[in-house]
From Swiss-Prot:
InterPro entries: aa-tRNA-synth_I_CS, aa-tRNA-synth_Ia, Leu-tRNA-ligase, Leu_tRNA-synth_edit, M/V/L/I-tRNA-synth_anticd-bd, Methionyl/Leucyl_tRNA_Synth, Rossmann-like_a/b/a_fold, tRNAsynth_Ia_anticodon-bd. NCBIfam families: leuS_bact. It is an enzyme of class 6 (ligase). GO terms for molecular function: aminoacyl-tRNA deacylase activity; ATP binding; leucine-tRNA ligase activity. This is Leucine--tRNA ligase. A motif ('KMSKS' region) lies at residues 582-586. Its EC number is 6.1.1.4. It comes from Oenococcus oeni (strain ATCC BAA-331 / PSU-1). GO terms for biological process: leucyl-tRNA aminoacylation.
Length: 810
């Protein structure tokens, strides 16, 4: 007998909606809080894929589990709805991005609701809602006031031949030096951008990782991205140009005696000033040649090294040697000082460059064979004057002392982390609330006038402005403003990146309808920080780092009560195709969750995705295994029901105690496994329990009710239905979580082998608390043992309960 999943799921989803079953209780409820959330989705036109329910079910299990354990649970959902795909679609089709984004959200929400997640929908947020991005703009204004938001000339990807007069494209839209759409040539050019000074928080972002319950791999990725290192700044004067010096940062100042040339990034501001007339043409040609290369291409270790000589020389401060200054694309202006001292004997990239351009290679650390390759290991110093015979640590300390004493450099802590380029030349994003005035002044839009709303643009206005500005430059009536004193101004045309709205959304869920403040301080104090945050590992760095940065900034302002937003982070594994490949349309292996829900039911999909394997591991999809889960749920249905609407008559009030042990084992294991997010093994244990119920003559009602509670977090619809049929008037959602009796789990009997003269001749079941004499009597009374010793004399019996029985005979 199969249950009607369509009718049951529709009935309970309607019930939960109408009764607002999962509306979060007030902060004054007196209950301890549990704040659990997923990384909110971008509502694409494609809708949900089977990867979404995996992480959503995981958080829903934790939400439902903790509600029954007496926690006040906040589990919200929202939409990260700004983004490039919507704008590209709008330009292509002529539809307004706001309109079809809202349509996408409706479709997404319908799909999410069909899976029975226990969200508090009264807290739903949408990053494109002006009442939401009012506060995104407000945070930007606070950053601006504190000097953490500023404008700077930044290298961008500029496609001047793009239809409409040119466009700035993101790194991910550049393929082999051309635009993804239309294959127009892309050039790296400087353009004014808004930048956030995340580097001011580098040390705190690094050190506070230690206090977080996050996967170590994610923390390590953030540490590497922040990239703290200790080394030295070294100053090289330019020969013949006493006004100029090149500053380099190096973690190995001890190799200074091995520096045989220098390399500047082609964009370095000294390049034009120091290049000689003889080398000017080569340098200009080289700069033009690499203008379209992305940072990723430029730093590819497998690429052949290229460069151009400037004709200038730097003076090595430690020995006065003149060394040639080159430019090369493998040095980036955005990292360090945009200049390096090259020690080819001990650096692989420098070695390859030196070999290609026939530059000197001078060994200063003992070891290896530098005629074949760079030696990058540790060793004692050679050819290094006063550093000779010192090891790495000693030499670094000594050379830094020397540099500081001679004003030629100093010890320095450096970070790989760069300031966050915050502006995009796009329409579909939060407007940056800044006005540029004709008199050169720059002001923020007054807080009382926020939100600064996006103007409606038609299809023609949505096209590139042709100036490198966003399409907002085409919205003249919105763009141009006049001050009270008659001075004219222009609004900022750049918009914020998609990361902006997701950098603080977890705070707005706490108080989503407050129009006076970002969120009520008392509510923030009660709910923060997030107890469990679940999402993909692909957001390991950018989203999580930006959210931590904004949160720390708001903490410094006294807005939020915690230093960190997310206490525990879990990354779900990927659901792969049946062939273990990533699901994609091109491979034809995409599974549509709507079809699964229609054919097998939402509960079957939820249970299956949790049963596939550990949450954090990648797993291949199997429709056969899904069908097996559906059969299991049908078995659950059959053990509880009889024909019609009745309950199975063997479910009775009295307890014959035959299920005591398996029931208590199941409650214990499921409770512990849910708490540790081991959902697959919890489900396995519940399968064992149901198998045992089919062998029983009577099923205690107390145990069967409790089983429904155990299964409910994974399969909420079928359990709500059966809970009601068991005679309950209220929803199962807030029923008190079952407890177990440890004494019922402990083994009351154990099997022991009986040896005769050291050989096993029989096996007996004995009580665990049996005495030695009783154990000896049980052994000798055993019929098999009696036969073996019938014609023999028993010399002695060694009987140790729980360990050994050995009868010695002659």
């Amino acid at each position: 007998m199969s249950y009607d999943h369509k009718a049951i799921e529709k009935r309970w989803q309607t019930y939960w909606d109408e009764h607002k079953t999962f509306k979060t209780a007030p902060e004054t409820s007196g209950k301890p809080k549990y704040y659990v959330m997923n990384m909110f989705p971008y509502p694409s036109g494609q809708g949900l894929h089977v990867g979404h329910p995996e992480s959503y079910t995981a958080t829903d299990i934790m939400a439902r589990f903790n509600r029954m354990r007496g926690f006040n649970v906040l589990q919200p959902m929202g939409w990260d709805a700004f983004g490039l795909p919507a704008e590209q679609y709008a330009i292509k089709t002529g539809h307004n991005p706001a309109d079809f984004t809202n349509e996408n959200i409706k479709h997404f929400k319908k799909q999410v609701k069909s899976l029975g997640f226990s969200y508090d929908w009264d807290r739903e947020i949408n990053t494109t809602d002006p009442e939401y991005y009012k506060w995104t703009q407000w945070i930007f204004e606070q950053l601006y006031k504190k000097g953490l938001a500023y404008e700077d000339e930044i290298m961008v990807n500029w496609a001047p031949d793009f239809p409409g007069g040119g466009i700035v494209v993101a790194n991910e839209e550049v393929i082999d030096g051309k635009t993804e759409r239309g294959s127009y040539p892309v050039y790296r050019v400087p353009m004014k951008q808004w930048v956030l000074r995340i580097t001011k928080y580098a040390e705190r972002l690094l050190s506070d990782l230690d206090d977080l319950d996050w996967p170590e791999a994610i923390k390590e990725q953030q540490r590497n991205w922040i990239g703290k290192s200790t080394g030295a700044a070294v100053f090289f004067k330019v020969d013949g140009k006493s006004d100029y010096q090149v500053e380099v940062y190096t973690t190995r100042p001890d190799t200074l005696f091995g520096a045989s040339y220098m390399v500047l990034a082609p964009e370095h501001d000294l390049v034009d000033k120091i290049t000689t007339s003889e080398c000017r043409a080569d340098v200009d040609a080289y700069k033009a040649k690499i203008a379209s290369k992305s940072d990723l291409e430029r730093t590819d270790l497998n690429r052949e090294k290229t460069g151009a000589f400037t004709g200038a020389y730097g003076i090595n401060p430690v020995n006065g040697e003149k060394i040639p200054i080159w430019i090369a694309d493998y040095v980036l202006s955005s990292y360090g000082t945009g200049a390096i001292m090259a020690v080819p004997a001990h650096d692989t990239r420098d070695y390859e460059f030196a070999k290609k351009f026939d530059l000197p290679i001078r060994q200063v650390i003992k070891g290896g064979d530098i005629s074949k390759e760079a030696f990058t290991g540790d060793g004692t110093h050679i050819n290094s004057a006063f550093l000779d015979v010192l090891d790495k640590k000693q030499a670094i300390e000594k050379i830094i002392d020397w540099l500081e004493e001679h004003d030629a450099g100093h010890k320095q802590v450096n970070y790989k982390l760069r300031d966050w380029i915050f502006s995009r030349q796009r329409y579909w994003g939060e407007p940056i609330p800044v006005i540029h005035w004709e008199d050169g002044k720059q002001t923020l839009v007054p807080e009382s006038e926020l939100p600064l709303r996006l103007p409606h643009l038609n299809q023609d206005q949505m096209k590139p402005s042709g100036t490198g500005e966003s399409p907002l430059a085409n919205a003249k009536s919105w763009l141009e403003v006049t001050r009270q004193d008659g001075v004219k101004g222009r609004r900022e045309t750049n918009t914020m990146p998609q990361w902006a709205g997701s950098s603080w959304y977890f705070l707005r869920y706490i108080d989503p309808h407050n129009d006076k403040v970002l969120a009520d301080p008392e509510k923030l104090k009660y709910w923060m920080n997030v107890d469990l945050y679940v999402g993909g590992a692909e957001h390991a760095v950018l989203h999580l780092l930006y959210a931590r940065f904004w949160h720390k900034f708001l903490y410094d302002l006294g807005i939020v009560p915690t230093k960190e937003p997310f206490q525990k982070l879990v990354n779900q594994g990927m659901i792969l195709g049946t062939n273990h490949e990533k699901m994609s349309k091109s491979k034809g292996n995409v599974v549509n969750p709507d079809e699964i829900v229609d054919s097998y039911g939402a509960d079957a999909l939820r249970v299956y995705e949790m049963f596939m394997g550990p949450l954090t591991q990648s797993k291949p999809w199997s429709t056969e295994s899904l069908a097996g889960i559906r059969r299991y749920l049908d078995r659950v249905w059959r053990i509880f029901t009889s024909d019609g609407d009745g309950i199975n008559p063997i479910i009775v009030s009295e307890n014959d105690h035959k299920l005591d042990k398996i029931f208590n084992q199941t409650v214990k294991k499921v409770t512990e496994d849910y708490a540790a997010m081991r959902f697959n093994t919890a489900i396995s244990q519940m399968m064992v329990f149901i198998n045992e119920t089919f062998k029983a003559e009577k099923l205690p009602k107390k145990y069967m009710n409790a089983f429904l509670q155990l299964l409910n977090p994974v399969a909420p619809h079928i359990t709500e239905e059966l809970w009601q049929r068991m005679g309950h008037q209220e929803t199962i959602a807030y029923a008190t979580w079952p407890t177990y009796d440890e004494s019922q789990i402990i083994e009351k009997q154990i099997e022991m082998a009986v040896q005769i003269n050291g050989k096993v001749r029989a096996k007996i079941n004995t009580p665990v608390d049996i005495s030695r004499d009783e154990l000896a009597k049980m052994a000798t009374d055993n019929p098999d043992v009696k036969k073996q010793v019938a014609d023999k004399n028993i010399v002695k019996i060694i009987a140790i309960p729980g360990k050994i029985i050995n009868i010695v005979v002659k």
